[in-house]
Amino acid sequence: MAESKPTPQSTFTGPIVVDPITRIEGHLRIMVEVENGKVKDAWSSSQLFRGLEIILKGRDPRDAQHFTQRACGVCTYVHALASSRCVDDAVKVSIPANARMMRNLVMASQYLHDHLVHFYHLHALDWVDVTAALKADPNKAAKLAASIAPARPGNSAKALKAVQDKLKAFVESGQLGIFTNAYFLGGHKAYYLPPEVDLIATAHYLEALHMQVKAASAMAILGGKNPHTQFTVVGGCSNYQGLTKDPLANYLALSKEVCQFVNECYIPDLLAVAGFYKDWGGIGGTSNYLAFGEFATDDSSPEKHLATSQFPSGVITGRDLGKVDNVDLGAIYEDVKYSWYAPGGDGKHPYDGVTDPKYTKLDDKDHYSWMKAPRYKGKAMEVGPLARTFIAYAKGQPDFKKVVDMVLGKLSVPATALHSTLGRTAARGIETAIVCANMEKWIKEMADSGAKDNTLCAKWEMPEESKGVGLADAPRGALSHWIRIKGKKIDNFQLVVPSTWNLGPRGAQGDKSPVEEALIGTPIADPKRPVEILRTVHAFDPCIACGVHVIEPETNEILKFKVC
């Protein structure tokens, strides 16, 4: 069906600044140097100082989860989970099986929610021209949808025509809202989906708005609320009602509805769009991958978490899928040489991390980010869906092998094509399909366990002095919270988050972060509308671009755009 084209490339030479790229979980500024239409160098700068580590110092360790969740309004639960796990480790408590399974189920809903939101509402519009859907033939679009996905009412010619009519009225009103000044308006060389695919994707974009609510509602059934769940406690969970029949039945019903959309829309849409952009299987790659693993069958310690996660943990270096190393938590450290922090913090393990801000100036390539630069044995590591997918695939995990091979077969590309922006985007769909395939089984396991024994929380005592680490593999990637307790209070707390791994600055040796590495070689068709930069950066899921400033190198004119 798909006819992939080569990505167009200009002859432009000069700098481009995209600022800000995201309005969630920090404001991101990307600066690149372009030579003959390709990115030659890149700098990733976080513009938001967080300071949660400073806020937490001196507080009760049990309070950590309530503060750290506020780092983000999208992937909120993962910080509660990592904080709870790090205090679990510090007090040396082994949580009950019911608590482990309930925590895992809420994480499963987080995956469904985040990956759907990312594909349709944060990333798809880097590839899909919404206004081009007006040129589509709804009958052809319906036939195309029937050829790539199971029959469903929303894919009928009548339903697609209704979406097209709604879109037409929206465009003719002149009030384009979130699409105002979008890169695809007026046409763009880098957008080349057939109008029928644009129409199908736009219809599912709208439907996905309802699906994300259902996924969030499922999280709230077990988590108490969304965002910012309130069911995790040190030693387990507090939602005893979540073990009973009606809440679990409601959770299952919502999950089934979301997963039906995943299988009938998300995966077919992903494959359809990717089929027209297959050359992006050679753009945006990195070299090294790290995963802490998730959905563990034994969470009694960080070591057990690493060893028993159903989404496996591991380390891959140099793209060598023939060798997956075990994770050594002692090999993680953070550099601050290129960050806006006082010197002396380089090479610090998170237990000993120092957060001492020292801002210089914006246009400073020696110090240019509020993020630190995490490294593993001296190497920058990509974390997230692609890292998890490669590690699971290389380890021969059956679920991953089945879905990855299906995707590779449908696209007729080798596994090496996944080292890319395209692969990073596909990996999210792969994971979502696997979560859906296991969801009903996981729910039944908890229901059966809870029917026999409803224990949800284990007893423990706060030590005078201790330390602990909480590991999680959030939808965006490897997350770790590190705590030192002294006098039963937080003496030091450090968060090493996925965006820090992926989007941080250079390390002490001048080595680029994953996003900086991934941007090298990216072709730019139109330097005033550099959608290609957004494609690669958004593939790491720093969320959504709300405003872009592109600096024209000769006149220093700042061109302002709002980007969807």
UniProtKB/Swiss-Prot annotation:
GO molecular function, a single term: ferredoxin hydrogenase activity
Cofactor comment: Binds 1 nickel ion per subunit.
Cell compartment(s), UniProt: Periplasm
PROSITE patterns: NI_HGENASE_L_1, NI_HGENASE_L_2
Entry keyword set: Metal-binding, Nickel, Oxidoreductase, Periplasm
EC number: 1.12.2.1
Metal-binding recorded as keyword: yes
Proregion span(s): 550-564
Cofactor: Ni(2+)
Catalytic activity: 2 Fe(III)-[cytochrome c3] + H2 = 2 Fe(II)-[cytochrome c3] + 2 H(+)
GO CC, alphabetical: periplasmic space
InterPro entries, per database record: Ni-dep_hyd_lsu, Ni-dep_hyd_lsu_Ni_BS, NiFe-Hase_large, NiFe/NiFeSe_hydrgnase_LSU
Keyword Translocase annotated: no
Gene3D superfamilies: Cytochrome-c3 Hydrogenase, chain B
Residue numbers binding Ni(2+): 72, 75, 543, 546
Subunit structure: Heterodimer of a large and a small subunit.
Family: Belongs to the [NiFe]/[NiFeSe] hydrogenase large subunit family.
Note: Perhaps the leader of the small subunit serves as a transport vehicle for both subunits.
Descriptive protein name: Periplasmic [NiFe] hydrogenase large subunit
Gene name tied to this protein: hydB
